[in-house]
């Protein structure tokens, strides 16, 4: 399962080379509305630029379809209504009808907006940022709030109800959740940077994400073979190695008392 939000043409071409002769072995999630301009990534809602970037992606990957066409990065309600009442959603539906994408998805960091997309009945996959720190935070249209130090300065108790409702709604409606930012940009792997004051392991972060309702996969970013192996270790990890609750227990500012964490300890 490969998520390709990045629109860098060199990256697309390199992945295309790696897929040669084994396309059917991979599920490819490509993003609509992510373009490459002036040698850098750009989010767009321009339908012509979106079409051009989509066709470039197919060409460089040497394929004639994407398994998931992910409408890229919709965090505000204004943007949601622009996308779902305009040419972008019509393009996504047309590409699906033509067989160029098999399933329509949407990526977001805001549970309110993500819920609107799920309730629209037009998406089958939701890419959402999930980890034990972000789950404490209330909805926001500003993604920077998720990792701002001041967001964790006060006492926080239990999973934010809007996030919890979103995960349960996805499960009820059969919407697959795939997870981004499972490591919190790497902060959760560092005792110094983690709001918990304790470092989690990649295995614990992945286990946390996979135990949320409706989660089907976790998109882990790796820049080395060692980082790749650290994620793969989840497959053979023991129950004790997967247990993420010790990191969260006994911290003054954080409490999950009387609230389900899906850890399975009560089973």
Model-derived segments and their meaning:
Residues 56-80:
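Active-site groove signature of glycoside hydrolases
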Residues 47-58, 91:
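Short, well-ordered amphipathic alpha-helical segments that serve as non-catalytic structural scaffolds
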Residues 30-32, 65, 70-73, 130, ...:
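Short, small-residue-rich loop/turn micro-motifs
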Residues 21-51, 72-75:
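Structural motif corresponding to the early beta-alpha repeats
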């Amino acid at each position: 399962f490969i998520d390709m939000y990045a629109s860098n043409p060199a990256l697309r071409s390199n992945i295309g080379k790696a897929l040669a002769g084994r396309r059917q072995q991979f599920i490819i999630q490509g993003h609509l509305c992510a373009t490459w301009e002036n040698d850098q990534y750009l989010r767009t809602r321009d339908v012509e630029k979106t079409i051009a970037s989509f066709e470039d992606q197919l060409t460089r990957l040497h394929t004639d379809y994407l398994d998931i066409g992910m409408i890229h990065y919709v965090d505000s309600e204004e943007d949601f209504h622009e996308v779902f009442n305009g040419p972008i959603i019509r393009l996504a539906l047309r590409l699906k009808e033509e067989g160029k994408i098999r399933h329509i998805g949407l990526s977001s960091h805001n549970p309110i907006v993500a819920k609107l997309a799920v309730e629209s009945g037009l998406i089958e996959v939701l890419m959402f940022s999930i980890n034990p720190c972000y789950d404490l935070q209330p909805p926001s249209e500003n993604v920077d709030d998720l990792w701002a130090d001041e967001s964790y300065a006060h006492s926080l108790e239990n999973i934010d109800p809007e996030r919890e409702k979103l995960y349960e709604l996805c499960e009820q409606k059969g919407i697959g959740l795939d997870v981004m930012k499972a490591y919190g940009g790497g902060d959760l792997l560092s005792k110094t940077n983690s709001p918990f004051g304790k470092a989690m392991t990649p295995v614990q972060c992945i286990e946390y994400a996979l135990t949320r309702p409706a989660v089907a996969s976790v998109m882990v970013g790796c820049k080395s073979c060692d980082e790749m192996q650290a994620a793969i270790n989840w497959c053979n990890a023991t129950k004790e190695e997967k247990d993420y609750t010790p990191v969260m227990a006994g911290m003054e500012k954080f409490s999950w008392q009387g609230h389900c964490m899906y850890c399975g300890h009560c089973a």
